[in-house]
From Swiss-Prot:
Factors inducing expression: Constitutively expressed in all growth phases, part of the MSMEG_1276-phd-doc-MSMEG_1279 operon.
UniProt source species: Mycolicibacterium smegmatis (strain ATCC 700084 / mc(2)155)
Name the record gives this protein: Uncharacterized protein MSMEG_1276/MSMEI_1238.1
Renumbered residue ranges of the record's region Disordered: 53-98
Domain of life: Bacteria
InterPro entries the UniProt entry points to: MSMEG_1276-like_NTP-PPase_dom
Amino acid sequence: MAQLVRDRIPELIRASGRTPVIRTLSDDEYWAALDAKLDEEVAELRAADTRDAALEGGRHRHRGESASGNGIQHGVPPNVALIPSGSTLLTPARSGHV
């Protein structure tokens, strides 16, 4: 089953003596995969039996579905922002940028 990989997962697989099968996605493939993963995480979050299950235990994961969805944000390149509806965007001033 294909998985989006982040962090050091291939390194950890190699360290265990196994060989990961990986490939780098094109930009279009990456965004399509990220979109599909977000749909999957939202469905799991909605399927959580209670608010506590969604935030803490989740139905299928020890860290909760909201944490899984948060992981999607880490896969988004730094020049893209995911902002919840109704939020106020505050952008920190950066040197040379207004």
